[in-house]
Amino acid sequence: IQSTSMDQGSLSEDSMNSFIRTLIQAGIWKNKVPKQTARTKDGMQTTVKKTEAEPDVRLGFQPIVSVDAELLRQQRRFSSPRVLLSENTPLEPPPLYLMEEPMVLNRTSRRKRFAEGKSHRGEYSVCDSESRWVTDKSSAVDIRGHQVTVLGEIRMGPS
């Protein structure tokens, strides 16, 4: 693991994926106590836990942790059907961003055709919608966010 300062400019997508992977592997998200390596008089390294009595001199310093690409290939246990960390850029933007494209807003221009069977690797929504009939629901939330009553029976015609 290497640390660099934040003054290197903007981060690439690969370095951000590496950073997320490293956080998961290092257990930083579990609030583990960081360790420091100290040298003894005979030159041997020992690992010392950092205590609150030792204030960090670099209070404003936030390191960026980068991981070798080989480490990404070795660790497959963090794979998820919803999130894919990859070194390669996706073939097209995620579906949520298609409405922001100027091509979609201008309906007079021709749409680009794509070949069948293209890969959608890495393009999963965070929360997949579920379409199914619900029969035991008495109240619901409409598209404006208001609580509404669900009718159990709809009468048609004159009453």
Curated annotation (Swiss-Prot):
Transmembrane segments: none annotated. The keyword Lipid metabolism does not apply. The keyword Glycoprotein applies. It comes from Loxocemus bicolor. Belongs to the NGF-beta family. It holds the Pfam family NTF3_N. One of its GO terms (cellular component) is axon. It is found in: Secreted. Keywords: Cleavage on pair of basic residues, Glycoprotein, Growth factor, Secreted, Signal. It comes from the Eukaryota. The lineage of its organism: Eukaryota, Metazoa, Chordata, Craniata, Vertebrata. InterPro entries: Cystine-knot_cytokine (IPR029034), Nerve_growth_factor-like (IPR020408), Nerve_growth_factor-rel (IPR002072), Neurotrophin-3 (IPR015578), NTF3_N (IPR045815). GO terms for biological process: cell surface receptor protein tyrosine kinase signaling pathway; modulation of chemical synaptic transmission; negative regulation of neuron apoptotic process; nerve development; nerve growth factor signaling pathway; neuron projection morphogenesis. GO terms for molecular function: growth factor activity; nerve growth factor receptor binding. Glycans are attached at N106. Residues 4-113 form a propeptide. SMART domains: NGF. This is Neurotrophin-3. Seems to promote the survival of visceral and proprioceptive sensory neurons. Residues 1-3 form the signal peptide. PANTHER family: NERVE GROWTH FACTOR NGF -RELATED, NEUROTROPHIN-3.
